[in-house]
């Protein structure tokens, strides 16, 4: 069982490490290339900026974002399994649920941009009023969904950082650093949400450089650092079978128990299996007394 558990841990490490590293790179690259947009209620200005974007480039930008968030969700799911094996089942449940739901929201609403952009641009050129109305409805719905998705991923980062530090999976500076920026992101989104509820202004914290670079960039660096660390541990953690020179136990390869050597087998166990032990011979009768003369 020890070698099976070791193989599980190594599989989790390489899967989660690759998901974190590749996902963080794709998300950071996409957000760096993403144009700065005005407030959500300034629909005419948003449409003016989007009209200058090429449909193919806009679709590829969002496809890269979708792939990045899917890989990040896979990384968090694997990290949750790793924490579960270490005994932190509560934190693992929080991480897995938040990552799966948050990644699904990001992927679902960003993938709509694959076809919304050319559709809205064509409709706005024919029916400006109808195009603006449909775009406004979609845009507000999208911003609310991805705001919730961002808070869920922030929660996953905070739980992974704190639980990983307590279980020795991360150094203290890395775990607590990720948790700090994740909590900071949650606070910023909460303030923006409360402000939108009080003033009626639209929620869109991603349009500000502070959220995109002061909060988002450190978290993407955290994802990349955790991913690289997991892949390094995977590379340094040799399989049990490889360390044993490639020899595998007979139970694992043939399903039969290994045969003991004659030197390790007692004399009573050297008999053929199924043969009954020989009955002890009867004692010889005592010698007759000498004849009487």
Model-derived features: positions:
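Intrinsically disordered, low-complexity proline-rich regions
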Residues: 281-292
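Hydrophobic, aromatic-enriched alpha-helical segments typical of multi-pass transmembrane helices
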Residues: 2-262, 266, 274, 291
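A general signal for intrinsically disordered, low-complexity N-terminal leader regions
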Residues: 271, 275-281
């Amino acid at each position: 069982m020890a070698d099976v558990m070791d193989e599980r841990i190594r599989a989790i490490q390489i899967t989660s490490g690759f998901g974190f590293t590749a996902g963080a790179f794709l998300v950071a690259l996409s957000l760096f290339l993403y144009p700065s947009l005005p407030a959500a209620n300034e629909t005419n200005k948003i449409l003016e900026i989007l009209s200058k974007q090429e449909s193919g480039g806009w679709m590829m930008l969002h496809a890269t974002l979708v792939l990045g968030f899917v890989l990040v969700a896979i990384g968090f799911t694997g990290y949750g399994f790793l924490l579960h094996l270490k005994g932190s089942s509560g934190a693992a449940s929080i991480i897995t649920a938040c990552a799966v739901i948050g990644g699904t929201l990001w992927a679902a609403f960003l993938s709509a941009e694959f076809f919304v952009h050319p559709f809205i641009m064509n409709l706005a050129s024919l029916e400006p009023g109808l195009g603006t109305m449909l775009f406004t409805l979609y845009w507000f719905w999208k911003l609310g969904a991805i705001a919730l998705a961002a808070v869920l991923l922030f929660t996953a980062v905070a739980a992974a950082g704190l639980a990983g530090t307590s279980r020795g999976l991360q150094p203290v500076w890395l775990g607590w650093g990720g948790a700090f920026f994740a909590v900071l992101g949650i606070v910023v989104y909460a303030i923006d949400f409360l402000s939108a509820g009080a003033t009626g202004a639209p929620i869109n914290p991603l349009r500000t450089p502070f959220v995109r670079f002061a909060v988002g960039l450190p978290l993407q660096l955290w994802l990349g650092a955790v991913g690289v660390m997991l892949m390094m541990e995977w590379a340094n953690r040799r399989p049990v079978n490889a360390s044993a020179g490639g020899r595998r136990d007979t139970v694992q390869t043939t399903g039969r128990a290994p045969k003991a050597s004659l030197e390790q087998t007692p004399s009573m166990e050297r008999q053929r299996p199924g043969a009954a032990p020989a009955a002890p011979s009867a004692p010889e009768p005592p010698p007759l007394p000498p004849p009487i003369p």
